[in-house]
């Protein structure tokens, strides 16, 4: 018997991806050990927006399946997880963007998503704080919000899961080396630690994308839906330089989250005044009343992005025993349940409800070294 064998599965990373994988595996009867260094990761830094995106079929399948799973899990979540289905309202500033909204509407409707096109007058009725002159919008009714740090903590407190705060300095297939030099082994090791994954697997094509967020003081509720400009999609996939887009999310506390920004080629966690100002200016262009609210805190986080915008979910093709759940960029909270279900289906050699192929690590890391 191997004295270092400590669990059926070791998961590196206690964010929402690692926590959801741990919960799903534990509910299949496996003993799970979750190791995390305790650094401020994307789960703590993000908005917790649960949304369906349809930029490509694989993204739509992953996000739509995940939102269904979140709705199934919702009755179990404690109140501090702040789960709400408040919908996303995509804002069209002009006729060109309204045409994009119409195209998204037809696509989502064809895939069974509850959505509604909203004209200029109806938009102001739904969200009176928006500026005059917007062309309209697209309401995705099943989208929602979640306080992801609380959800991750709840998941990790479930039966069959042990969590340790410790830094992993090396990974070799079925085993990991801790900061003090001790090795721990399991039948399976899952890497789910976001941008830190490249420290253990330098071959992973993961790029950090820095983002800023601001939260306001508490005010009487004035915003119902999560408000996102349709230009956000273009901004999110901009690969050449810094960008901002209006993203305003109401919290159950009466506060507003305000985003969003993207920067490349930096790991500096400091809030940058010029970028924060640019982001807030963009949000005020859509909701002028924001200029009169008190912002109480601003912070940054890093999205772990893959070259094609889809996560790497599956076995590492060159490292036997090592599995990957990384590269979710800004959709980690949304797609955590689908990620976990895809991994579990592969581990148990079971069919999955969505195709695994688009997310397999082989597309970047090559085919397995052996047949």
Model features per residue range: what roles?
Residues 3-15, 33:
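Beta1/beta-strand and adjacent pyrophosphate-binding region of the FAD-binding site
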Residues 10-12, 184-196, 340:
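Short hydrophobic core segments
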Residues 23-27, 50, 81-83, 193-317:
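Active-site substrate-recognition segment that forms the wall
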Residues 26-44:
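Glycine-rich FAD pyrophosphate-binding loop
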Residues 47-126, 283-284:
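Dinucleotide-binding Rossmann-like beta1-alpha1 core, especially the glycine-rich loop
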Residues 61, 90-100, 138-154, 270-275, ...:
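Short beta-strand to alpha-helix junction loop
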Residues 138-173, 178-180:
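Helical element adjacent to the flavin cofactor pocket in flavoenzyme catalytic cores
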Residues 284-371:
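C-terminal catalytic lobe of FAD-dependent flavoproteins
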